[in-house]
């Protein structure tokens, strides 16, 4: 009994010390009735990041709502079936490009991801702030690299990408573990090069569902490493689900690309390569409800009821001292 009590007290002390390491430098608690556009850019396009996604991203699918169970005021990304600008469904994506950036420190987000079922691909991630605007993951833009360099901008993946959490991968669908299967990832390199760029993704099957309810996703990023954690608030000693050394600083080594400011991205995709439900073309002009991949999407109710991704807060910390 005494040993158990001593262990519990030590755990509390360690947790308190860990919290005191960090100083909050920015947050969005999403308590207002409208989105703070001093922080956030909303996207209005059907590009889908070069991933053959099926949705149209529109600002109307971004709302501020009270969570029906917990009562927290949240940012909400909505995905739904509807014919809209040559797409069979709509959803939301927003970012802090050139408004809020992070370079090293800790990033936390408390998110209730929707049940992805078959077809949803939600994510919380980051891109290098030096990425040229309105280009995204387009392998056709490498030819513009020289011009962009003169403007201080680069193309993907030279900017670097940090995926703090993604859900909806086809392995989870194929094995019936969609609600417990997720990943962290990093992408980098000098050019897209037909997909032959350096990257690493680490997938995890959790013991409990990570969809439907709120969970805390944490990135800890230093000059030497990147690490990602699930539910560190509940389990302070939890091991990271993703780790990457940044000690290698040469071209095509990760440390060469994750040493500058990054911006935040939230999105709720429908279809695409990740869940193995891509459109027939990478950048199609028209996708209809008869598209074979869209026919396989089970996550969106037939009556057009939105599926919701709730974000309670995002917080950025720097180490004290």
Regions found by a protein language model. Give the residues of each.
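GH16 jelly-roll
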Residues: 18-321
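Bacterial Sec-dependent N-terminal signal peptides
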Residues: 1-21
């Amino acid at each position: 009994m005494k040993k158990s009590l001593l262990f519990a007290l030590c755990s509390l002390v360690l947790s308190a010390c860990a919290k005191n390491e960090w100083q909050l430098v920015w947050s969005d608690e999403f308590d207002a009735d409208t989105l703070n556009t001093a922080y956030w850019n909303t996207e209005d396009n059907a590009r889908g990041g070069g991933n053959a996604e099926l949705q149209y991203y529109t600002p109307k699918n971004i709302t501020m709502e009270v969570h029906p169970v917990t009562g927290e005021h949240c940012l909400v990304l909505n995905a739904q079936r509807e014919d809209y600008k040559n797409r069979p469904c709509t959803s939301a994506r927003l970012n802090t490009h050139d408004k809020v950036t992070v370079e090293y420190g800790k990033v936390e987000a408390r998110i209730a991801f929707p049940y992805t079922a078959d077809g949803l691909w939600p994510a919380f991630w980051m891109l290098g702030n030096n990425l040229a605007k309105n280009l995204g993951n387009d392998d056709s833009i490498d030819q513009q690299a020289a011009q962009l360099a003169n403007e201080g901008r680069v193309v993907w993946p030279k900017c670097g990408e940090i995926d703090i959490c993604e859900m909806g991968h086809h392995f989870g669908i194929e094995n019936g573990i969609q609600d417990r299967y997720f990943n962290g990832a990093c992408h980098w390199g000098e050019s897209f090069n037909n997909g032959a760029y350096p990257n690493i993704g680490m997938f995890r099957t959790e013991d409990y569902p990570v969809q439907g309810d709120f969970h805390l996703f944490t990135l800890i990023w230093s000059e030497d490493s990147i690490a990602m954690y699930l539910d560190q608030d509940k389990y302070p000693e939890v091991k990271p689900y993703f780790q990457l050394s940044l000690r290698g600083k040469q071209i095509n080594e990760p440390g060469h690309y994750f040493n500058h400011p990054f911006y935040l991205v939230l999105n709720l995709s429908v279809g695409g390569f990740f869940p193995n439900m891509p459109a027939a073309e990478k950048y199609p002009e028209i996708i209809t409800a008869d598209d074979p991949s869209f026919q396989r999407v089970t996550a969106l109710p037939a009556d057009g009821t939105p599926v919701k991704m709730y974000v309670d807060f995002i917080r950025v910390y720097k180490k004290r001292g």
